[in-house]
Amino acid sequence: MHWADATSEKIMKKRNAEEYVVSSGITPSGHIHIGNARETLTADAVYKGMLKKGAEAKLIFIADDYDPLRKLYPFLPKEFEKYIGMPLSEIPCPQGCCKSYADHFLMPFLNSLEDLGVEITTHRANECYKAGMYNDAIITALENRLKIKELLDSYRKEPLADDWYPLNVVCEKCGKMHETKVINYNSEDKTITYVCKCGFENTVKPFNGIGKLPWRVDWPARWNIFGVTAEPMGKDHAASGGSYDTGIKIARQIFNYQAPEKMVYEWIQLKVGDKAMPMSSSSGVVFAVKDWTEICHPEVLRFLILKGKPTKHIDFDLKAISNLVDDYDELERKYFELIEKQKTEELNDNENEKISLYELVTPKIPERLPLQVAYRFCSIIAQIALDKETQKIDMERVFDILGRNGYNPAEFSEYDKSRLEKRLYMSKKWASDYGENLEINDLDQAKEQYETLSEEQKAWLKAFSKEVENIEIDANTIHELMYETATKLNLAPKEAFVASYKILLGKNYGPKLGSFLASLKKEFVIGRFNLTE
């Protein structure tokens, strides 16, 4: 059984609720990266597991856009220093293209969720507070101030100040919430008196966005407000004495609510060189979800995140993304094989889990096994078939190349062609930004490389080019011909390959050579190996 099915089953048995609400949330203080997406996709997987079992369930997302800007992040201009302490929803867009700072970072993520197959109801904290959804919780927190302080202090080395109040007020003059302090609460008329470092002081009702609960009180309050029954959380929140531990007690003793079941997830680390570093918007170590959808299929991101348990950390290497796509393609082939197999045989647990995983990570399952052209090969084809003036890929050239590599383009469905074209453009961008750009040497560069070769390699180049004149060029024929001609001249095949890569790319290595040469025009291959083109 896949972990998402097992988790949803466990939660349903424990809670036995009429309706389940699975929640996730993010503070849009910077670029929302694939590490953040792990929380939302984990929630989505468990939610889908509940639906599979016939349960009534909802999936919600809380955008914590009423949190303050905490510091001047490296990606912000110096002038944004004046906004530190203001709610993210009230700060202008750093590039002037969105309604607010929060929207600038939030909207690309929300827009990508549809591509990722996530259907979710979004609640923005700033709108919820301003609409009065937290008003009752604010009163409850203020009237139970000392009890909340006692609960929080039991987990703290240093107790909170005796005059602490569980409320952050947005100053009506300067708009900041990190420099205000509540100095009194009047339980009769439900007003608070606050002072701000800017010199402003006022007595107001702390409702409809005037006040915001601090995180350790806000979280259990929202569980109650939205009826949350399950929520993924990072290991920092789930640690002993963390905000989940205090949240359990505040939810039960202050808001009379049972805390949701926790689902702890590990970080996704971004591999930079030989080091793997935890992703963090504030540190600038990020790979945004919107960037993923430019270089790879959304279902492959779901596959990366959901194939293993959430408690397993993931090292993500951008240079190895082609291997990840290969693994997804292998799962896809296995899925359609097992769908046929189960018509006549009973599948074992491992086979059923493969079916569950593919269905979970693939939002739109094709009717039959679609065309699969390896991602790395697509990156090569895309660069060869690219019109440098228009930056468009010549699909007729692509079909010609594939025809010489064992494919039959006449059998491609419209779905196949559409998916192939997407993969070509995505893999081209990947090769350009993160992989290896395919830059074929010009003739002068090829001649320079030629002079570095042994006499045996030079003789082989001429013999090989002569033989190519007499064949119909395709990947297998080219591959066999390279071995045959090298063997005849007593040249190690490896040396023939090195000679080919050097006069083509100026390197000792390169893409799979048979497929690569079959992707080029026959006249060019003959001319290059003769050093005339």
UniProtKB/Swiss-Prot annotation:
Main location: cytoplasm
Pfam short name (any one): tRNA-synt_1f
Keyword Transferase (UniProt): no
Key words of the record: Aminoacyl-tRNA synthetase, ATP-binding, Cytoplasm, Ligase, Nucleotide-binding, Protein biosynthesis
Residue span of motif 'KMSKS' region: 278-282
Annotated EC: 6.1.1.6
GO MF terms, alphabetically ordered: ATP binding; lysine-tRNA ligase activity; tRNA binding
GO-annotated cellular components: cytoplasm
Annotated compartments: Cytoplasm
Catalyzed reactions per annotation: tRNA(Lys) + L-lysine + ATP = L-lysyl-tRNA(Lys) + AMP + diphosphate
Motif range ('HIGH' region): 28-36
GO term, biological process aspect, one: lysyl-tRNA aminoacylation
Family in the record: Belongs to the class-I aminoacyl-tRNA synthetase family.
HAMAP family: Lys_tRNA_synth_class1 (MF_00177)
UniProt cross-references to PANTHER family, sorted A to Z: LYSINE--TRNA LIGASE
Remarks, miscellaneous: Able to charge E.coli tRNA(Lys) in vitro.
Listed name of the protein: Lysine--tRNA ligase
